[in-house]
């Protein structure tokens, strides 16, 4: 055989071998790809099956109910006292702007305690915090029962506010830490339900109880409920995350307390000053107090932010607010509850002081809207789990503005039925949307910082409530200034005018809050490069 023929045969053989190798390699790659796809499908199916099989333990439900009950009782007594304002004004001989401190100082105490909740969670066991909240709730209730001077009532409300300030974020932290991941939206809705049922029944309970018993009986009834919550909590609470040697910086705590109190005092005293100016009295001192409180509040807030940035162990890790999505959610979570909590105050007082209804009827007017809101909070959580954040938040929050808008349109010819109906519209849509705002924001926060996010958002919620009550009470007081005594026709008309002013203010605040949420969603879309549900 010639050399050329041998070379040709060798090339043919090599070509065949290469072909076989290529074929085998392709077959192997195809098989590997198929196997990888099968493994991926199997993994996805297993993950789906695992997620679907996640269950909520009875002890977790018991823990949520026990801790949430303390927050429930605190909010219940807050809304009960709101409907009793006219009676308290007569008993203790105080004005509208003074009696509102029964609610405002409670909310301020809650708000001042919230920033400490992240430290408390890291430093102390869950059961110890729970029992401390129980003790504070009991002590506050006992003082309310025996108090016969107005300052003592305020002291009791401070004690109760601190107890609720421990209990509310503790419940949220338990849900975030111990819930199955696929059930967080629903359980956050349940947490909202525990808290929002209180405003639903608070004014009605207040009106019903005081129609047959002294108002102090409300706190007598609260004591066995607190003890029942204590029993459930002691049996169900579990410590899933170990404690650590966290450090509390006293100057940071002092700064945030001064900031919150200073800002609300500035709002309150500003209203007093305007009221005196309208009635022709000397308002110089009140304006000076307003300016001092505003400077102290803003200065303390700036100092707190400065110390938090430089501290090794900050009271609150404010760095999470550098994310514009989280920041805008926090602003909205301050503004919308400001409207919601103030709304109940305005309705009950307009009903009594303008329409002349009884305490019981005034409290009952809030019941339908608050009850439907309480029922819809878990529904909002289900929508979040099913559809994501955008639609379950923006659509209902936008429609909720219809409630105060109708109030404003009919403000000078409102009836009791209109007050109840328009509040029902607001309560229904607000509850569905607002139940998901904190959940949506915390989805952007790393796990290790979620307790800080929880504390920040709960502080925003309570500060918004305190500011809302003070703001709307101030607006009503300004409208009532110089218009005669309670019960006169001029006073009733002035209260209706003040109600119209508050409803207009509510609309503006709702629009700003909704705009913040819509902007946050757009930023999230741009950042992710895809549509966010």
Annotate each predicted stretch with a short phrase.
Residues 212-332:
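Hydrophobic transmembrane-helix bundles of small-molecule transporters
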Residues 1-22, 26-75, 90:
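Cytosolic juxtamembrane N-terminal segment immediately preceding the first transmembrane helix
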Residues 181-183, 447-449, 487:
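Transmembrane-helix boundary and interhelical linker motifs in polytopic inner-membrane proteins
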Residues 60-76, 81-85, 92-111, 115-118, ...:
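12-transmembrane solute porter fold
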Residues 145-152, 234-237, 267-273, 305-309, ...:
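Transmembrane helix-loop junctions and nearby membrane-interface residues
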Residues 107, 114-251:
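Helix-loop-helix hairpins in multi-pass membrane proteins, especially solute transporters
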